[in-house]
From Swiss-Prot:
SUPFAM superfamilies: Peptide methionine sulfoxide reductase. The active site is at C18. It catalyses: L-methionyl-[protein] + [thioredoxin]-disulfide + H2O = L-methionyl-(S)-S-oxide-[protein] + [thioredoxin]-dithiol; [thioredoxin]-disulfide + L-methionine + H2O = L-methionine (S)-S-oxide + [thioredoxin]-dithiol. It is an enzyme of class 1 (oxidoreductase). This is Peptide methionine sulfoxide reductase MsrA 2.
Amino acid sequence: MDEKAAPGSETAIFAGGCFWGVQGVFQHVKGVSKAVSGYTGGAKDDAVYETVGTGRTGHAESVEITYDPSKVTYGQLLQVYFSVAHNPTQLNFQGPDSGTQYRSTIFAENDTQKQIAQSYIDQLDKAKLYPAPIVTTIETGKTFYPAENYHQDFLTLNPTYPYIVYNDLPKVANLKQLFPALYSEKPVLVLSASN
C-alpha cells in the first residue's frame, strides 16, 4: 500500500498548526518539489489571512505539498507529518496558537489518500504511541487557497524570528535526526530569496 509509484507528481495537503513550521519541514523532504502555505477546509470561495485568523471561516492553515511518488511515498509524508511536523493529539491548537484554523487535519486528495491516512491513524492509535488520543481529522473535496507571499518560505527567510527559533527550527532538526534518508539540507522554496 506504500510502494513507490512511477515518476510524476502528486499533491498532499496537511494542516497542523501554524503553516510556517509545517511548510518549513516539508521543504526539507527529498522528493518534495513544492510546499506552499495556504488555507483549506472553509466554506467561503476564497481565503486570506485576516479572515482565516478570526477562526470563523472554517479554513485551516495548511500546506499543499507537491511530491514525486517515485522518490517519497504518501505514507512517508504521513510519517513526517505525524512525527515531526505537528502534534496530532492537540485539538484546535498547536503550541502557542489556538483556534480551529490551527487544527490537525489531512485534506485527502482522493479515496486512496483517505484510506492510507485512516489506516495510518488506526495503526498509531492501536500502537498507543502518543500519551493522548490522536485528534487528526480527514476531510475530502476541499479547495486549497495559497497564502499571501509574505507567509511563503517564512521559516527559511526568517530563521532568527523568535517564534521560528522556538517552535519551528526544532521540527526541522527532528526531521534531520529521525529521517536522515528523507532529509534534504537545501529547502525547496516557493519564492526566491530576492523577492
